[in-house]
Amino acid sequence: MADKGTENFDLEGSSWYIVHEAECTDSIDTLEDLCDESDSNVSNLIDDDVVDQGNSLALYNAKITDDCDNAIAHLKRKYNKSPEQAVAELSPQLQAVKITPERNSKRRLFQEDSGIFEDEAENSLTQVESNSQTGGNSQDGGGDINLLLLQTSNRRATMLAKFKDWYGVSYNEITRVYKSDKSCSDNWVIVIFRAAVEVLESSKIVLQQHCTYIQVKIFGFSALYLLQFKSAKSRETVQKLMCSMLNIQEFQILTDPPKLRSVPTALYFYKQAMLTESFVFGQTPDWIAKQTLVSHQAATTAETFELSKMVQWAYDNNLLEECDIAYHYAMYADEDANAAAYLKSNNQVKHVRDCSTMVRMYKRYEMRDMSMSEWIYKCCDECTEEGDWKPISQFLKYQGVNILSFLIVLKSFLKGIPKKNCIVIHGPPDTGKSLFCYSLVKFLKGKVVSYVNRSSHFWLQPLMDCKVGFMDDATYVCWTYIDQNLRNALDGNPMCIDAKHRAPQQLKLPPMLITSNIDVKQEQSLMYLHSRVQCFSFPNKMPFLDDGSPMYTFTDATWKSFFQKLGRQLELTDPEEESNGVPSRAFRCTSRSNSDSY
């Protein structure tokens, strides 16, 4: 076994920097002696006390709690939006700073103001902060609600909650929302908060000049109004009116139109009107009366639409055009149950077209079944005005036309005698030819045809539905066309007319009135028309008054007086004489049951 100890290797010349063993000294034996003999002035430099354990567990719990709080705050900041009011309190300029621009949903870009209330879930994150110390020292007792409205971040939610507590119904259940302040309505529900009682009482009188119906219920310093204005108003106009009248601000007002088709809404206001604390002025609005009042009409309400009733109504009112029937029958829905059922129908266009077709058929048959005398007296009966026939006589005399000659030609014209079935009035321009003829055709409910439509196969079709036809300002080309194609039309004999959507119709054309600047009988190229027309010349220009109106005017009342005065000379027979005094039965196209009574 090798010897214990340190083995040294002798290296020449290295003894001066290689230390092989520590040198022992006996001058200082212990650490205490070293400290005692030190020349340092610092006492107790080394802490030699016993080390304590301490409360390390509490320190650990505090650190874990801080870490959890920071993690929860990070999650809240990530998933919860900061309240808008808090941002505004930090800085007004900071509220306007937005990193991401706001974008509206595409499905709402073109949404109209339909009045349908949207879901309120989108506003559910809005925080409502209220001050617990509000209005405790108010002298008038109503300052608490005003201060509350000013201090809350969502004023509308606070106002809706107060309204439901005071009036026992939700505001959104009795109103429909207008998104735009420009939308107009006749009826408005208005809720006022924090207004003087004296001003609220005086508004009952002031509003009467603006409204046809007023219902006011005052509760403390608030009031509920149901108003029907004389003319439609927007929300802006209503707010300005109430603010100026009650001396309040716009944030103290809730205003929206009521739900006009809601039965609970109508019943609510109907019940409020019967309370003693409610003030009512005017007649109950129609939308409330229809849904609350019982009438005899409810027993006869039509479950389905009946076309025959619509046809009978259009026939009685002498409505033939589709636009007239559609518009006036829609307005009739307030009075007639069948018209109301028509508005609910999805086939309104078809019903209007069918109604117009049926009325035209009935009217066409009646016209064809009447003689010319009966038709003229029928036109006279429909004219309710009274006039004088002398302007016609004076105008003919002014134009140099013998009144007796005119009556003889007109008598043959009205009878439709062949070869005497057409009257031509010719002369220079501005002589009153068209004015004279148009007034006569209008009174007799005649039809006008134009040569410009000659290229159409159906340009003579209007002559099938009239007693008198009229063609204005016939040129030489037009006379040439008549000479080549329409000689038998002027004869007064039956001819074939092409009708649209029907087979060609064979009938006798009605008597024709034609105005022209050409004297047909002076044109030898139109010699075959000389025997088919009766001509009158109007050589003198129509005189005018200082205001620009013609001196001679011809109205329906003028022609009514003319035919009544000269009916015997024209050999017109009175329909009462033909029927021997027996009244004719009115036309009816609806079926009536035995239980119907009026």
Swiss-Prot record:
Domain (SF3 helicase): residue spans on this chain: 401-551
Crosslink site: Glycyl lysine isopeptide (Lys-Gly) (interchain with G-Cter in SUMO): 508
Gene Ontology cellular component annotations, sorted alphabetically: host cell nucleus
UniProt short sequence motif Nuclear localization signal, positions renumbered to this chain: 76-78
InterPro entries per UniProt: Helicase_SF3_DNA-vir, P-loop_NTPase, PPV_DNA_helicase_E1_C, PPV_DNA_helicase_E1_N, PPV_E1_DBD, PPV_E1_DBD_sf, Rep_E1_papillomaV, Znf_lg_T-Ag_D1_dom_sf
Positions bearing Phosphoserine: 82, 91
Span list, region Disordered: 573-598
Key word Hydrolase present: yes
GO MF term (any one): DNA helicase activity
Keyword terms, alphabetized: ATP-binding, DNA replication, DNA-binding, Early protein, Helicase, Host nucleus, Hydrolase, Isomerase, Isopeptide bond, Nucleotide-binding, Phosphoprotein, Ubl conjugation
Region spans: DNA-binding region: 138-302
UniProt-listed Enzyme Commission number(s): 5.6.2.4
Subcellular location: Host nucleus
A Pfam entry, by short name: PPV_E1_C
Post-translational modification: Phosphorylated. Sumoylated.
Stated role: ATP-dependent DNA 3'-5' helicase required for initiation of viral DNA replication. It forms a complex with the viral E2 protein. The E1-E2 complex binds to the replication origin which contains binding sites for both proteins. During the initial step, a dimer of E1 interacts with a dimer of protein E2 leading to a complex that binds the viral origin of replication with high specificity. Then, a second dimer of E1 displaces the E2 dimer in an ATP-dependent manner to form the E1 tetramer.
Assembly: Can form hexamers. Interacts with E2 protein; this interaction increases E1 DNA binding specificity. Interacts with host DNA polymerase subunit POLA2. Interacts with host single stranded DNA-binding protein RPA1. Interacts with host TOP1; this interaction stimulates the enzymatic activity of TOP1.
Protein family according to the UniProt entry: Belongs to the papillomaviridae E1 protein family.
Protein name per the record: Replication protein E1
Organism the protein comes from: Human papillomavirus 65
